[in-house]
Swiss-Prot record:
This is Ubiquitin carboxyl-terminal hydrolase 37. Residues 704-723, 806-825, 828-847 form the UIM domain. Residues 243-257, 681-695, 719-732, 774-786 have a biased composition (Basic and acidic residues). Changing C350A: Abolishes deubiquitinase activity. A motif (KEN box 1) lies at residues 32-34.
Length: 979
């Protein structure tokens, strides 16, 4: 099997389509216009998917999958992931080597395999037409006899034996993969030959049209450094050359070109190769000609070839742009530095930037959020989890303006729930973190609640679907932990357990004693879990005193610790920041706070087993939940705060009064025979959209004021949302609360007020004489229907026209007033932003000098210090550097508050990047590299929130990343050695 077309089960994952199922198909490499692409074909048919590979490969991984089979996994720059399984190991290895060569930009246009280069030729065919090649070959035959007389036939025989082998099209005797067999013969002369390309443009065009057999024969002879041509018969020296010989050959070629004796000098330089061509072998190497691989000497066909065709000019231009292997490349560090860009400060939003950078650095958290196939189009546009994920995906690949816009959307999503974050005043980073995590959990709960009840067509018999349909909440699997509080009666020993879930722990600063060294985060954590006495009435014995112990019942992957760096001054009624020095250890241990029943953190594979990876079908990518005729319509649980806003405008109070008046007048014209019966029907059918006839024939005159108001609201709500016929039941409705755009910046749907698709009951029996149908829309943009068959038709129309004119006048006045209020509000907001920014800068500058605090600080006055034995203290000290104790956690991020007061200052974040295996400081938009020791020493007085990852989870992630990088490095070395 050709290594450039491999077959097996294929799975694709991307942000647009989610994760697809395994389907039989093939990967095929196609080269076109100096670009290499991967074409995915499925055996079931359909349109092939094409992925560009040139400058787009992020990682290539090959893993064993059964006996003599492998799985090839390809990651692109946009985090798209392609896998093909059950591929023969040999073919998979050759494909991997080729992809790595493309990844490392070591497969330029001038060196791509052609039809004669082994097994790659069937796919990356030649660019020269067969007709042109045949013309070249026939020309070579005609010229061979004329040149034999002047050539040295002594060296011709062994060379012809090597190149005349019919099997030379794929030189299978050379060790290595398909790439190693093809590229070495081209790279040996690429460097000196490039210098001759800029000398004579006409000559280069003509040299391009020479045959592939001429080119292949020129390479060994040009590198010949002996008179008896030993290099032609020695395989180990066949593709090696002396740099000095190349330079001499190049110099001689330039002298020949300037002397004008091109045909004669060319023939004497290359010996008798032209006369010894065997076209039976040369015919299998079509279009091996390329500008970057041409020799600098003039070709023998100078006076006989026709004028260059446009195809040759096009080829020349493409290859001339490529400068070859020795082109100075931009160092990898510069690319990383370009990607390392922080978040813009929108106006005192440093607290948000610091928290987001710390959360985004949690690799397991990001994987659980992005890689389980969450149907983003099912989630409302303004939901935090959607805004959060969009920013996480785009933060390293979009420009600063787009990133700033995404940041605003994240802030607005949180401000919609917590108004204290809506302005531009300073806020506490821990409060923002708590709000963010709680809101993400709520969004996931709402998604799972809707997802469980939604039917999925065509998946009833699928073995991949388990009984529980649920997506994994990244907050629960990574950050949430459970603590069991045991209340023990000191009189009778009765134990009352109570469990509580936390996303983080707020720990106190221990009171510092002068002779002792500074306390550490470990001390504060142990202080939190110490046993304490409290007054408690025992139900069993009536005792009044109890002891409370706290133990971990379930551990998190990442433990977040919030250090209370503030104290309340009762006299001044102010919160003061505590600048006490606190040692930040590399490792923490929770072993003394765990029991034998304590559950370990969720493993990294837990999410994949528990979450249902449901591929997004075309029907699931619309902008709303689909309403099925066989099942009731389900409302998405993300609802608006005010249900009245669904059908009424903000200034619709007068309209409501008029609707009530019209309804009362209508009741006087209606009969009273079926009023009670219709009222009962209306109360029974309240979950379903009632008929117009039922609502309008209801006994309005017998209703109370509240009941009448509710009935009129029901009519207005029904008329405000357009109903669909039975023919449109299968068509989804568009809504901003249920749509997911591909880039979150799209046009709003047509019906923004429609929350769900409602089907009106079919009206089977209507008596035009018994009632009059009145329809009034809330937006007042539609024409009102006039009643038919009523006695007061003329009076009603006149009164309605007068009311309509009055309403229009009131609407204009309200609109003008609203615009004035909006302008005033915007002006006030701008003033608040400027004032807050100036105040923040002033307070920050005034407090920066005192940011380090004082050694006189003694921590919180009501908190005692922990007492350890000498052995315990020594053990904790060793564990702080090694993490050898059970249940140890490793420091991965610190959020620091710079400033002397708790009401003002600036937040920064230090995070450990597992992929780069280095620490970085994020100061809003600025990013800088920092050493871990500097983080521990520089943040000992300003560290506010600390992120610690479970050591086993950290080691597993780090090992996976190292293996991935070492695999790429090995592949690069192997490829370079082969070249």
């Amino acid at each position: 099997m050709s290594p450039l077309k491999i077959h097996g089960p294929i799975r694709i994952r991307s942000m647009q389509t989610g994760i697809t199922k395994w389907k039989e198909g093939s990967f095929e490499i196609v080269e076109k216009e100096n670009k290499v692409s991967l074409v995915v074909h499925y055996n079931t048919g359909g349109i092939p998917r094409i992925f560009q590979l040139s400058h787009n490969i992020k990682n290539v991984v090959l893993r064993p999958s059964g006996a003599k089979q492998s799985r090839l996994m390809l990651t692109l720059q946009d985090n798209s992931f392609l896998s093909i399984d059950k591929v023969p190991s040999k073919d998979a290895e050759e494909m991997r080597l080729f992809l790595d060569a493309v990844h490392q930009n070591r497969l330029p246009a001038a060196m791509k395999p052609s039809q004669g280069s082994g097994s790659f030729g069937a796919i990356l065919g030649s660019r020269t037409s067969q007709k042109e090649t045949s013309r070249q070959l026939s020309y070579s035959d005609n010229q061979a006899s004329a040149k034999r007389g002047s050539l040295e036939t002594k060296d011709d025989i062994p060379f012809r034996k090597v190149l005349g082998n019919p099997g030379r099209g794929s030189i299978k005797t050379v060790a290595g993969s398909g790439i190693a067999r093809t590229i070495p013969s081209l790279t040996s002369t690429s460097t000196p030959l490039r210098s001759g390309l800029l000398e004579n443009r006409t000559e280069k065009r003509k040299r391009m049209i020479s045959t592939g057999s001429e080119l292949n024969e020129d390479y060994p002879k040009e590198n010949d450094s002996s008179s008896n041509n030993k290099a032609m018969t020695d395989p180990s020296r066949k593709y090696l050359t002396s740099s000095r010989e190349k330079q001499l050959s190049l110099k001689q070629s330039e002298e020949n070109r300037t002397s004008g004796l091109l045909p004669l000098q060319s023939s004497s330089f290359y010996g008798s190769r032209a006369g010894s061509k065997e076209h039976s072998s040369g015919g299998t190497n079509l279009d091996r000609t390329n500008v970057s691989s041409q020799t600098p000497s003039a070709k023998r066909s100078l006076g006989f070839l026709p004028q260059p065709v446009p195809l040759s000019v096009k080829k020349l231009r493409c290859n001339q742009d490529y400068t070859g292997w020795n082109k100075p490349r931009v160092p990898l560090s510069s690319h990383q530095q370009q990607q390392l860009q922080g978040f813009s400060n929108l106006g005192n939003t440093c607290y948000m930037n610091a928290i987001l950078q710390s959360l985004f650095s949690l690799q397991s958290f990001a994987n659980d959020l992005l890689k389980q196939g969450i149907p983003w189009k099912k989630i409302p546009l303004n939901a935090l989890i959607r805004r959060f994920a969009h920013l996480l995906v785009k933060k390293d690949i979009c420009n600063s303006e787009t990133k700033k816009d995404l940041l605003k959307k994240v802030k607005n999503a949180i401000s919609a729930t917590a108004e204290r974050f809506s302005g531009y005043m300073q806020n506490d980073a821990h409060e923002f973190l708590s709000q963010c995590l709680d809101q993400l959990k709520e969004d996931m709960e709402k998604l799972n609640k809707t997802w469980k009840t939604e039917p999925v067509s065509g998946e009833e018999n699928s073995p991949d679907i388990s009984a529980t349909r649920a997506y994994t909440c990244p907050v629960i699997t990574n950050l949430e932990f459970e603590v069991q509080h045991s209340i023990i009666c000191k009189a009778c020993g009765e134990i009352i357990p109570k469990r509580e879930q936390f996303n983080d722990l707020s720990i106190d600063l221990p009171r510092r004693k002068k002779p002792l060294p500074p306390r550490s985060i470990q001390d504060s954590l142990d202080l939190f879990f110490r046993a304490e006495e409290l007054e408690y009435s025992c139900e069993k014995c009536g005792g009044k005193c109890a002891l409370v112990r706290h133990k971990f019942n379930r551990l998190p992957r990442v433990l977040i610790l919030h250090l209370k760096r503030y104290s309340f001054n009762v006299a001044l009624s102010l919160n003061n920041k505590i600048g006490q020095q606190v040692i930040i250890p590399r490792y923490l241990t929770l072993s003394s706070h765990c029991t034998e029943n304590t559950k370990p953190p969720f493993t990294l594979g837990w999410s994949a087993h528990m979450a249902i990876s449901r591929p997004l079908k075309a029907s699931q990518m619309v902008n709303s939940c689909i309403t099925s005729p066989s099942t009731p319509s389900k409302k998405f649980t993300f609802k608006s705060k005010s249900s009245l806003a669904l059908c009424l405008d903000s200034d619709s109070e007068d309209e409501l009064k008029r609707s009530v008046a019209l309804s009362q007048r209508l009741c006087e014209m209606l009969g009273n025979e079926q009023q009670q019966e219709d009222l009962e029907k209306d109360s029974k059918l309240c979950p379903i959209e009632p008929d117009k006839s039922e609502l309008e024939n209801s006994g309005f005159d017998r209703m109370s004021e509240e009941e009448l108001l509710a009935a009129v609201l029901e009519i207005s709500k029904r008329d405000a949302s357009p109903s669909l016929s039975h023919e449109d039941d299968d068509k989804p409705t568009s809504s901003p609360d249920t749509g997911f755009a591909e880039d979150d910046i799209q046009e709003m749907p047509e019906n923004p007020d429609t929350m769900e698709t409602e089907k009106p009951k079919t009206i089977t029996e209507l008596d035009p004489a018994s009632f009059t149908e009145i329809t009034k829309d809330c937006d007042e943009n539609k024409e009102n229907k006039t009643p038919e068959g009523s006695q007061g038709e003329v009076d009603w129309l006149q009164q309605y026209d007068m009311e309509r004119e009055r309403e229009e006048q009131e609407l204009q006045q309200a609109l003008a007033q609203s615009l004035q209020e909006q302008e005033a509000w915007e002006q006030k907001e701008d003033d608040d932003l400027k004032r807050a920014t100036e105040l923040s800068l002033q307070e920050f500058n005034n407090s920066f000098v005192d940011a380090l605090g004082s050694d006189e600080d003694s921590g919180n006055e009501d908190v005692f210090d922990m007492e350890y034995t000498e052995a315990e203290a020594e053990e904790l000290k060793r564990n702080a550097e090694t993490g050898n104790l059970p249940h140890s956690y490793r420091l991965i991020s610190v959020v620091s508050h710079i400033g002397s007061t708790s009401s003002s200052g600036h937040y920064i974040s230090d995070v450990y990047d597992i992929k780069k295996q280095a620490w970085f400081t994020y100061n809003d938009l600025e990013v800088s590299k920092i050493q871990e020791a500097a983080v521990q020493s520089d943040r000992d007085r300003s560290g506010y929130i600390f992120f610690y990852m479970h050591k086993e989870i950290f080691d597993e992630l780090l090992e996976t990343e190292k293996n991935s990088q070492s695999l790429s490095t090995e592949v690069g070395k192997t490829t370079r050695q082969a070249l």
